[in-house]
Amino acid sequence: MTRQWEILREYDEIKYEFFEGIAKVTINRPEVRNAFTPKTVAEMIDAFSRARDDQNVSVIVLTGEGDKAFCSGGDQKKRGHGGYVGEDDIPRLNVLDLQRLIRVIPKPVIAMVRGYAIGGGNVLNVVCDLTIAADNAIFGQTGPKVGSFDAGYGSGYLARIVGHKKAREIWYLCRQYNAQEALDMGLVNTVVPLEQVEDETVKWCKDIMQHSPTALRFLKAAMNADTDGLAGLQQMAGDATLLYYTTDEAKEGRDAFKEKRNPDFDQFPKFP
């Protein structure tokens, strides 16, 4: 099915589009298998932040341009002494900020993977909430081959997903795994023919959009809290505070302060 995606904002190295409640962020560097630069990542951070704040967006899809690659990680040609060097000549590892943003956005983020999801590209797949893989998808880590590694979500959280033994295999041997192997180890949620991957992804998005956004927000925060320590707890606590602010009980405290009177909290139930 052909869809008319609406361009929400123009970028140099990514696309940011919208269709019926779905925001789609596409890494647009197919000539290098959608490897990212500091600029690519900065643009993705901006797009994801806009999707987070947009009340018309219910689900976010992350993908790569073309059928050959989702993302092949950091562009090694941009790698300098202390990180990946952008136009400002400052070495950065700002993809770590993007990983955290994807985790804390209170909306489901789905990776739509076609072709290679390698290195930092596989880590982006890992931090997304769900993954729809085309049958030509290839996953793997290359860090130890090129003098790099991801000691955060790319290893610790990966081990939670596929198990410690498998995660060590993935990192120590730097092998590549096809879509079926990724499905078998729990790295993706489903595998579909390449020509159906967008249709299936949109279907999953539409199914998700039938459900309570507040419930989904808390479920994401709860599952993140299990792996993200105090930062994860902060996310869930912040969501709880936001929900509390919408209650009459919280509004009574606020209004009493503004009206310079004592709050009447006795009117509210004390549930067991």
Curated annotation (Swiss-Prot):
Give the reactions, separated by semicolons, that this protein catalyses: 2-succinylbenzoyl-CoA + H(+) = 1,4-dihydroxy-2-naphthoyl-CoA + H2O
What does the protein in this record do?
A: Converts o-succinylbenzoyl-CoA (OSB-CoA) to 1,4-dihydroxy-2-naphthoyl-CoA (DHNA-CoA).
Protein name, entry field: 1,4-dihydroxy-2-naphthoyl-CoA synthase
Q: Cite the position(s) of the site with description Important for catalysis.
A: 84, 245
A Gene Ontology cellular component where this protein is annotated is: cytosol
Q: Which InterPro entries match?
A: ClpP/crotonase-like_dom_sf, DHNA-CoA_synthase_MenB, Enoyl-CoA_hyd/isom_CS, Enoyl-CoA_hydra/iso, Enoyl-CoA_hydra_C
Gene name for this UniProt entry: menB
Residues the record lists as binding substrate: 33, 72-76, 84, 116-120, 142, 148, 245, 260
- EC numbers for this chain: 4.1.3.36
Q: Which family does it belong to?
A: Belongs to the enoyl-CoA hydratase/isomerase family. MenB subfamily.
Judging by the UniProt lineage, the source's domain of life is Bacteria
Q: Which Gene3D superfamilies match?
A: 2-enoyl-CoA Hydratase, Chain A, domain 1, Lyase 2-enoyl-coa Hydratase, Chain A, domain 2
